[in-house]
């Protein structure tokens, strides 16, 4: 009944108007699983590779080759297989590709199939995806890390750091957390407008004002939290995504917006100063992806009390994560399904993190779709945190709305992670 009878891939558009892959998987009993693949702007050098067509069409960003690979090679390899055999199906696709980074068939092709297979199997079992993947113990609703001011590669402004986030740790429920985030978002919009800043939004729905420094952005957010009627640090904490690889040049951190260049040790000290001055509980990619010494310095400095998330550092890859664990580097992994390219490898990365007492943060990409799979995966893995953008743009809100539905479906079983995510 759960045998795969057909796989149909197509080229659709993501939230930036760029092509991406969508896959439908049909089963013998009529079940359908559909998944659309996200795409990043600031990508780690060690990520699995998206297959793009090149040429003039869509400025080289077309995905017809990846679509063709799904409709022919991948279908020939897994057609007829039982959709419940997720690990075996993912392994076959990895072997079929035959490269260490999925560059022949494309991680975008493989991931689309991997997620659609799981969704089809869940529908066949008459289970929500989070329950099918996570089992009976999947009930923890994540703290949303809401990216309300954008800089770096996500915005056209002088701010060096890529994301400034609010975390409603004092909320009672996920539904409350979304409300708190929304209220602060709208206060921030008024605050920015009153100071003459534009309130256009970036790729992830956050504002991209012409501020020149991290402290300036943090000050605006602190003021907005208080004006919305909440206590910074107690009810709402702050998070940063520095995306430091983007401004790491010749062994130094070049903060153009702030007009200074820092050695790795000084960069770690600067982040420690910010974490001491503001209620910052999480810093992502505080150091560059291959600056392992800088990462070690930062971890030694503030790792006991601040969540230090490896995104470009670990790229959702269990092998790189194990290296980091062995070296005592960072204490958390950002989980992006398209960085590694299959559901099986994604779940393995979360499990590896949890076994080492590292936290895991489920995450979107800057190029998203209306697909809300990561909302289910956040609950399935009980990871307790999700990054899926700001409180605007339907590609971001699709995930928040799905989590509201999941919380409602769980009823009294649902538990909001809240302040349990804090270190120290």
Curated annotation (Swiss-Prot):
Required cofactor(s): Mg(2+)
Active site, per annotation: 204 (proton donor), 336 (proton acceptor)
Positions contributing to Mg(2+) binding: 241, 284, 311
Cellular compartments annotated: Cytoplasm; Secreted; Cell surface
Binding site for (2R)-2-phosphoglycerate: 162, 336, 365-366, 387
Swiss-Prot/TrEMBL keywords: Cytoplasm, Glycolysis, Lyase, Magnesium, Metal-binding, Secreted
One Gene Ontology term from the biological process aspect of the record: glycolytic process
Record function comment: Catalyzes the reversible conversion of 2-phosphoglycerate (2-PG) into phosphoenolpyruvate (PEP). It is essential for the degradation of carbohydrates via glycolysis.
Family label: Belongs to the enolase family.
Protein name: Enolase
């Amino acid at each position: 009944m759960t045998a795969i009878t057909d796989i149909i891939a197509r080229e659709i558009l993501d939230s930036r108007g760029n092509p991406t892959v969508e896959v439908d998987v049909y089963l013998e009993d009529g079940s359908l699983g559909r998944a659309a693949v996200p795409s990043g702007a600031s990508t780690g050098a060690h990520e699995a590779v998206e297959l793009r067509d090149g040429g003039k069409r869509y400025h080289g960003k077309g995905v017809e080759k990846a679509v063709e690979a799904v409709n022919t090679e991948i279908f020939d390899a897994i057609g007829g297989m039982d959709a419940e055999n997720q690990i075996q199906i993912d392994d076959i696709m990895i072997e079929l590709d035959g490269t260490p980074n999925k560059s022949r068939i494309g991680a975008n092709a493989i991931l689309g199939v991997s997620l659609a297979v799981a969704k089809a199997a869940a529908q066949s079992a008459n289970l929500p995806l989070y329950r099918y993947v996570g089992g009976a113990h999947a009930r923890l609703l994540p703290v949303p890390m809401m990216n309300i001011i954008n800089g770096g590669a996500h915005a056209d402004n002088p701010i060096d750091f890529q994301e400034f986030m609010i975390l409603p740790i004092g909320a009672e429920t996920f539904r409350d957390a979304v409300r708190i985030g929304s209220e602060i978002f709208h206060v921030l919009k008024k605050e920015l407008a009153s100071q003459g800043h534009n309130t256009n939004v970036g790729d992830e729905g956050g504002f991209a004002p012409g501020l020149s420094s991290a402290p300036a952005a943090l000050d605006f957010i602190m003021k907005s939290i208080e004006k919305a009627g909440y206590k910074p640090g107690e009810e709402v904490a702050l998070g940063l995504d520095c995306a430091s690889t983007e401004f790491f040049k010749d062994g130094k951190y070049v903060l153009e917006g702030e007009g200074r260049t820092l050695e790795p040790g000084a960069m770690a000290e600067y982040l420690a100063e910010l974490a001491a001055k503001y209620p910052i509980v999480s810093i992502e990619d505080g150091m560059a992806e291959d600056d392992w010494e800088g990462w070690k310095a930062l971890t030694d400095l503030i790792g006991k009390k601040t969540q230090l998330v490896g995104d470009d550092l670990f790229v959702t890859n269990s092998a790189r994560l194990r290296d980091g664990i062995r070296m005592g580097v960072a204490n958390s992994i950002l989980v992006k399904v398209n960085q590694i390219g299959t559901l099986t490898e994604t779940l393995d990365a979360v499990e590896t993190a949890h076994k080492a007492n590292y936290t895991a943060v489920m995450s979107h990409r800057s190029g998203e779709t209306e697909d809300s799979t990561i909302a289910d995966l956040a609950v399935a893995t009980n990871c307790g945190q999700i990054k899926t953008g700001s409180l605007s743009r339907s590609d971001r809100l699709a995930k928040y709305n799905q989590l509201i539905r999941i919380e409602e479906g769980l009823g009294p079983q649902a538990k909001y992670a809240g302040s349990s995510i804090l270190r120290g």
